[in-house]
């Protein structure tokens, strides 16, 4: 039984390089900005946070939790539940298509994002 569990864990790691064991999406945890913008000085409106685990893509205004993910190759359909950080009120949205090129780059809503580390750069 332990051998089977270890084999499954090794296989999962090879399929999703860069992802932590508990991460649902194969992305590095941290800050992402539009690919055509510098990491340093990106505005709050441009910054997307990915914290891993069941956390979905957050922003300066919202925190989101993944409720469901389906995958077709490198295209993920993410259904999440978001709340306004200040009021706690629900932010309504639909499923989001995310194309993950590699552990540090993804495209969402026609915008390609790139990894900028774990902290916002001012």
Spell out what each predicted region is.
Residues 1-8:
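Bacterial N-terminal signal peptides that target proteins for export
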Residues 10, 15, 32-33, 58, ...:
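Processing junctions and N-termini across compartments
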Residues 16-21:
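Sec/Tat signal peptide C-region and signal peptidase I cleavage site
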Residues 22-63, 85-92:
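Short, solvent-exposed loop/hinge segments that bridge or flank secondary-structure elements
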Residues 23-27, 67-74, 99-103, 118:
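A short, structured loop/turn motif at beta-sheet edges
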Residues 28-31, 53-56, 72-79, 103-106:
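Short, hydrophobic/aromatic-rich segments at coil-to-beta transitions
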Residues 38, 79-122:
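Beta-sheet ligand-binding and adhesion/scaffold domains
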């Amino acid at each position: 039984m332990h051998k089977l569990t270890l084999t499954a864990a090794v296989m999962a790691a090879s399929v999703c390089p860069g992802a932590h064991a508990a991460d649902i999406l194969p992305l590095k945890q941290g800050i992402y900005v539009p690919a055509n913008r510098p990491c340093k000085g990106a505005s709050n409106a441009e910054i997307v946070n990915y914290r891993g685990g069941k956390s979905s893509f957050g922003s300066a205004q919202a925190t989101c939790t993944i409720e469901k993910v389906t995958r077709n190759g490198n295209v993920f359909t993410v259904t999440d539940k978001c709340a306004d950080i200040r009021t706690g009120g629900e932010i309504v949205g639909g499923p989001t298509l995310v194309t993950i090129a590699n552990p540090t780059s993804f495209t969402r809503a026609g915008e390609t994002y790139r990894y900028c580390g774990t902290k916002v750069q001012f």
